[in-house]
Amino acid sequence: MSEGESKSTHFGYKTVEADKKAELVAGVFHSVAAKYDIMNDVMSFGIHRFWKRHTIEVSGARPGMKVLDLAGGTGDLTAKFSHLVGDKGEVVLADINDSMLKVGRTKLRDKGIVNNVSYVQANAEALPFPDNHFDIITIAFGLRNVTDKDAALRSMNRVLKPGGKLLVLEFSKPQHEIMRKVYDLYSFKVLPKMGELITKDADSYEYLAESIRMHPDQDTLKQMMVDAGFEQVDYTNMTDGIVALHRGYKF
């Protein structure tokens, strides 16, 4: 790359300047924030609740722990963690998108979840937290939207305590051909129509489908976590690999 030439990355299937992607992704989530929870239930037939519940179970969160729910959006995981860590624990819901943070804050406060939760607008690539600060970090359905995923994983490793655990819940690659065909049909034909009907925004859900296809597969993400300094990295496929939960530790 010549001096002064801009780096590029992908926004769905489009190639864009790397420094423009965050703004484009922000536009997607500003658009869908108000109907985000409804769309999650509709487009996953409610199965996202099972995926998130499994993530909570695997986390091993206990009273007194500090948890970072990164790209935490509307707060589904934060709500569960708040109960698990108790009054002596702390949960930070961090998201780069202020519209999502506002929805999450309002939802959790309406549920009476206020005492041990704080909200931070933050870029995953440069987390504004001290070194060795959190016992658990989760990032659910957020990593694929990050421009520099390697930088984000290194940043997560930095703020995780020794002995701490990172959980990455993300759309991935179906394991069987018939599921891949059904999933492609659903993603590219049905999902945008749902988005248009419910949020009046088909384009954002076209981006969703494309961003999933451009995201690293299970083994590639596993190696990226290893390269970022995580150890004992493994993953569990759910729903035939439509979603994978990656787990890594910092020692």
From Swiss-Prot:
One Pfam family per UniProt: Ubie_methyltran
Binding site for S-adenosyl-L-methionine: 74, 95, 123-124
Molecular function as annotated in GO: 2-methoxy-6-polyprenyl-1,4-benzoquinol methyltransferase activity; demethylmenaquinone methyltransferase activity
Domain of life: Bacteria
InterPro entries from the UniProt entry: SAM-dependent_MTases_sf, UbiE/COQ5_MeTrFase, UbiE/COQ5_MeTrFase_CS
Pathway connected to this protein: Quinol/quinone metabolism; menaquinone biosynthesis; menaquinol from 1,4-dihydroxy-2-naphthoate: step 2/2; Cofactor biosynthesis; ubiquinone biosynthesis
EC number(s) from the headed UniProt entry: 2.1.1.163, 2.1.1.201
Alphabetic keyword roster: Menaquinone biosynthesis, Methyltransferase, S-adenosyl-L-methionine, Transferase, Ubiquinone biosynthesis
Keyword DNA damage among UniProt keywords: no
GO BP term, pick one: aerobic respiration
Annotated catalysed reactions: a 2-demethylmenaquinol + S-adenosyl-L-methionine = a menaquinol + S-adenosyl-L-homocysteine + H(+); a 2-methoxy-6-(all-trans-polyprenyl)benzene-1,4-diol + S-adenosyl-L-methionine = a 5-methoxy-2-methyl-3-(all-trans-polyprenyl)benzene-1,4-diol + S-adenosyl-L-homocysteine + H(+)
Family under the similarity heading: Belongs to the class I-like SAM-binding methyltransferase superfamily. MenG/UbiE family.
Function per UniProt: Methyltransferase required for the conversion of demethylmenaquinol (DMKH2) to menaquinol (MKH2) and the conversion of 2-polyprenyl-6-methoxy-1,4-benzoquinol (DDMQH2) to 2-polyprenyl-3-methyl-6-methoxy-1,4-benzoquinol (DMQH2).
Name assigned to this protein: Ubiquinone/menaquinone biosynthesis C-methyltransferase UbiE
Organism classification: Bacteria, Pseudomonadati, Pseudomonadota, Gammaproteobacteria, Alteromonadales
